[in-house]
A protein has these predicted regions:
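Helical element adjacent to the flavin cofactor pocket in flavoenzyme catalytic cores
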Residues: 97-109
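Glycine-rich active-site loop/strand segments that organize a redox cofactor
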Residues: 48, 53-99
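N-terminal acidic, proline/glycine-rich, low-complexity intrinsically disordered segments
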Residues: 1-6
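Beta1/beta-strand and adjacent pyrophosphate-binding region of the FAD-binding site
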Residues: 9-26
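Glycine-rich FAD pyrophosphate-binding loop
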Residues: 19-21, 35-61
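Generic structural signal for beta-strand residues in well-ordered domains
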Residues: 11-13, 34, 47, 68
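Short polybasic/polar patches that bind polyanions
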Residues: 35, 74, 105
Length: 109
């Protein structure tokens, strides 16, 4: 697991009181930031895997088989975790799902 910074005094006040709902892009970003601050949290996801609506296997997903990102991967990727070079500039939903899975696995989320 990557090293985390010591929690700031304000963050320490929140220890044990954070419920993180969803493991889509926003939930993963929030989880990573809490992790970097050293703030423990409990995550909740309705589906069995990460990716949120980008996970076509999620029964609640509204993504369709031919869906692609409409913005470049370079403006969408997490700053500290670039998308693989072989991923197209406008990734498919399957590439996005894999990216979110790899991000979660890499940071132990």
């Amino acid at each position: 697991m990557p090293e985390t910074s010591p929690a700031t005094p304000a963050a320490q006040d929140l220890r044990g009181h954070i419920a993180l709902i969803g493991a889509g892009p926003s939930g993963l970003a929030a989880a990573r930031n809490l992790q970097k601050l050293g703030v423990p949290f409990q995550g909740f996801e309705a589906h069995t895997d990460v990716g949120g609506l980008w996970n076509i296997d999620n029964p609640r997903s509204t993504v369709y088989e031919s869906a692609h990102l409409i913005s470049s991967k370079h403006t969408t990727e997490f700053t500290e975790f670039p998308m693989r070079p072989e991923v197209a500039d406008y990734p498919s939903h399957r590439d996005m799902r894999q990216y979110f899975f790899d991000f979660a696995e890499h940071f132990g989320l």
